Structure formats: C-alpha cells, structure tokens
C-alpha cells in the first residue's frame, strides 16, 4: 500500500482480503476506503466488514492520518488528536497492524499478505533449521570420546555460524519493523545460551575422559570458555528477571479478577437461606423468673414469700388447700423485724393468735376446722363467719336461758356467796334467788359463764388486760377476755402493789389518781394509795336493779363518810338511766363495773370513723348497732345516750360520786366480730394502745386455787378503786369533742 493511491482515490474503494489464522482457518474480509468526513483533508476512513457464523455482519471503522500514519479506532480519538495532538491509548501506526491478535479471544494471528515480505519469513525459517541441525550434531558428538577434536571444531564452527547469522539478520532487520527484530533476537539468544551450556558440559567431559590431551588444546578451550562465561551469565539474569516480572504481572491480574468477582457476587444476609446453623438459645424456666423477682440483698416481703412457696409446692392448675395456706401464713407471712401492715392482718389471723410453740385452744381448733371444711376458692361471707363463731362460743344449755352471766369475780367470804348481773329487771329476781348457791356450783358453771361473757363482750371495744394465754387445757377451755371502758387505752402509771396479786386480774388496775381539770379529762397525777380506802362503792349499792331485799351492807374496808356518800348517790340516781363516766380513761376490772363498760365502750369506739372503716375493711360488713341513737350537734349530748347505757357529763360539784344503771340488751348481729383478733389488732394500731387481756385465762386459773378470804379482800379493793376513779374523772370542758363522729349503719 502506497501513500499515492490513498491520496488520489477519494471515491470509495472496495477490496476483498483473505486472512489466514494460525489454526488454518481463513476469514474473508471486505475493506472499503473513503474520505473521512468531519476531519481535515487527507484523512482516510477504512471500514472492515466481516461475516461471522451465527452473527451479523461486523463493521469496524478506522481513521488513518496520512502524515503520521497513525490509525485511530474511533472518530472521537481522531478528532481529539487533531485538536490537542494527544494520541491516546488505542492509536497505532500502519505497519504495526501487519500482525495483531484477534479480538475474538482465540489467540489467533492474522497475516495480511499485502504487507508481509516473503523473503524475510523464509530466511527466518532457514536459520531455525540450521540451529536445530547444530544441536543434533552436538548430541551425536557427545557419544564418543574419540571424536573430541571434532566436537571442538564443531563448537568453533557453531559459534562462527551463529555470529554470521546474527550479523545477517541485523542488516536485514534494519529496514523492517523493530518488533520483528526483538522477536528474532530473543529466539537467537535462547538458542545461543543452550549451545553454551552444552559446551560447558562438553568441556567437563573432556577433562574426565581424555586426560592425555595436549596442553595447548586445553589452554585454547579454557580460554574460549572463560571469555564466554560473563556474557552468558548476564544474559541468563536478564531473562530470569523478565520472566519473573511477567509472572508477577499475570498473578496480580488474576488476583484482581478474583477480587472483582468476589465483590460483585451477591451474598445472602439471612443465615437460614445460607444454611448456617443458628446458635442454641437458652430456654426460659419458671424458677428462673421467680428468682429474678425476689430481691437479693433485702428480705422478701410476706406477700412475695407466700406466692413463691405456693408456686413451687402446688401445681399451677390446682388451687392450694386451706391447710397449705395456713402453713404458709404461719411460716412466712410476718417479717422478722417489721410490724405487718393492715393489709396483711386478715392473712395472719392464726399466726397472731397462736405462738408457734403454744398449743391451740379449743376456740382456735374450731376455727381451723371451719376453714378446712369450707372450699378454698369461695370466700366465707360475713354471715357465715358470724354463724360459725356464734356456734363456737354459745355454751351448752344448762336450763338458764334468758340470762347472760358475766364472769364475776364474786366476793367469797365465809359463805362464798356468788353474785350475777341479770340482763333486765325481770330476770333480777331469779338471779337473786340463785345467788345463794354453794361455791362448788359457781366453779361448775365457770366455763359456761366464760363463754357467755365472750358472747356478750364481743359487742364492746376495749383493751384486753392480762398476760399470755395459759397452756393448761384442763383448767381452761376458752380464753376469758375482759374489756375496759376506756376509749383512750392508756394504763401507764396506775398500777399499785396490789395489782400483782395472782388472785384476779380484775383487781390489778389503777387506783384513784390526782387529776386536774383539763380538756378532755386528761390525767396529770399519780394514784394515791390512801384514796383506795376512802372512796369505794359496792356493786349492790350502785346498781338500781338490785333487789331491795338484800339491803345495804357496809363493806369491811369502807369508812363512815364513804358509806354515807355512796348511799346518797344511790338515792339520787335510782330513777334515772344515766351513768356518769363519759370520756373516762380506765375502768377497774371488777365484774360489776365491766358489765356496763362493754356497752359504753362499744358505743364510744363505733363513733370513730377510723375504727369503723377498719371493721368494714376486715370483715366486709359494717357494724350495725341496735338501739344506738343518732348523734346530735350538741357535743355534750353526743355522749349521753349510747346503746342502752347513757352517760352524763360530770360537774366539779359532783366529784367523788358514783352511780350506774346496768341495762343489758340482747347482743347485736355483728357483735361476734369483736372477738376477732384482727379487729383487736386494728383497734390497737389506730388508737396507739397496747393490747391487754390475753392473760385473763392464766390469772383466772390461778385465782381458782386461792383462798376465799384473799379473793374477798382483793375484790373489795378493786370495787373501791373502780368507783373512786369514776367519781374523780370528769367530762372536761364543754368544747371537748372526743368521738363525736357518727357511725352510719351502711
């Protein structure tokens, strides 16, 4: 191809070329040449059209610059070269396109016959053949040691031939492409190095086999080998470096391809879809949950203890039996140091009544039996509770219906007379007739009177007096609880020497005190032991219900002035049902005085809304008191009438006077709730007093073994202290509004 034909032919020229690959396949290529549009004059557009099997015709455009003879594969590269002079990465000259790799990736070379010189190719092939002949001749010469001289000549001839070939090739390749020079030079140098290695082997063999050769020959051979050694080593190093660099480049390219593939491949984020096994998760157990709820350092609350124990002992679907509930309450509900709250009082009934080491009394045994009979899921209604408790406390019928026997610590003189307080005037006569019975009759019916007292006493609120219950089941079957007529519940500072007498707890109470007239009748002085002998009233003289046939007998320890004063008071208040003592702090434990104290204390305490709310909360029902009048706006009249027992305020002129009128109505329906220990504890919590009265059975059992004379003297002193204190205690100022709140029936 000449530059003249390209410049002259502006019209499209079409030629057909046949290109041969290395594998012998031939491709038919149509080449069209025309003037390039959009480029300076002289630029040629070359279009190669090829037909591929299974493909469409392929058109490859090339743009050729006639001056620089550069070939550009796209119009964009050609225009950039015209404007800026930048050749780019894909530009090549016209002669470089004679031998190029096919873009199909088959590694096939295409020879363009128009540009290949046949003579140069034939020369290269002939040279290669000569080199192969030389190698073969060398191998043959090594087989025999006799031909050593010939081999030396052959090596010299081989060196001469190779030098001549290299000179001829250098002259011819100056005209041709420099790329072909490099290829041929590489081939020749490789063959030359191989020949040099064979020469070294030959030299070694010569030394071993022919030791009788001439020194001249050895010197000539050694000199030739020494002269060629540095050249050979330099060539070997260069080839090794090139090979290593080529290998490194190929390895780096392969690694880059792998990284690209690994990054471009989509990965699964789900372990389930990827087939990765999940880590086993721990199973949550109920015990572990319960242990997390319970605090580690602090003592668990009673409610939490009960829940955890029930969950571990009883199956989750079954309800725990009442027996199990009772055990858990006794063992775990009450904390060791803190006082249980009001919410837990209902649950800890059995625990507060019973010490863990004491034995159950008959009353508590009956209560536990009732709890076991009733199903655990249904809660006992207040009506059912009242029925069960009343049945436990009513004594067997002894033929004396209609009378409520008070636990009277009767005065036992030489005749050991027994006195009882009837409920009304109609029964008083029968009571007086039966009062002449023998002392053993009183002892026989002591248990009945104790149970009757508990039935009547439940309607009155008061503080129990005494010590712990007795453990003797033979002498006492049910506890005897005696209440005070004292809404304030303070007994400190009133005990005297005679209080520690084991005969009767009724005598162990306060004596007359030195009081100042302050608001609400607060006591400010201590008791005077001399006052015990000056003011005392016998129950037979105080009560207007006593039979007149009995007469007024002076007490052995009473003085004349005290007897006259008591007689005067009995005459003044015989026609009225008003008894003084409103807001009195303490009543003596005499049987006659406490019989009226029950009703008055109940009426006073029921007016307190806190106690009323506690009763309603614990029992589920409100306490409805019969014959309880409504409370008026007058604070003095609010304390005058209460459930059959009325009080009148005491004036300063009426000091040291005492009289009482005993009226005992039938017990109300809600009276049984007052014997509940939880209600007793609630009253103790609300009023701030200490419960007393649990030691009554113990002292009662002890008093039965004492002599009658000692009991008579102690009871006489108790009655004196009782009446004297009531007369000394005044109502206070008119503005005192103690317990003035009304308690409604709902």
Curated annotation (Swiss-Prot):
- Write out the entry's keywords from A to Z: DNA-binding, Nucleus, Repeat, Transcription, Transcription regulation
Q: Where is the composition biased (Polar residues)?
A: 190-199, 427-451, 529-546, 702-730
Domain of life, source organism: Eukaryota
The reply on keyword Transcription is: yes
Question: What would be one Gene Ontology cellular-component term for the protein?
Answer: nucleus
**What would be an example GO MF term here?**
methyl-CpG binding
Q: Record's InterPro entries? A: MBD13-like, Methyl_CpG_DNA-bd
Q: Record keywords: DNA-binding included?
A: yes
Where does this polypeptide localize?
Nucleus
Residues in MBD domain copies: 29-104
Stretches with biased composition (Basic residues): 465-476
Region (Disordered) spans which residues?
Answer: 131-157, 169-283, 295-328, 348-479, 518-562, 696-746
Q: Where is the composition biased (Basic and acidic residues)?
A: 169-180, 244-260, 732-746
Its main subcellular localisation, reduced to a broad class, is nucleus
Which parts of the sequence form the motif Nuclear localization signal?
Answer: 13-20, 44-51, 256-263
Q: What is known of its domains?
A: The methyl-CpG-binding domain (MBD) functions both in binding to methylated DNA and in protein interactions.
Protein function: Probable transcriptional regulator.
* Protein name (record): Methyl-CpG-binding domain-containing protein 13
Q: Which organism is it from?
A: Arabidopsis thaliana
Q: What is the lineage of its organism?
A: Eukaryota, Viridiplantae, Streptophyta, Embryophyta, Tracheophyta
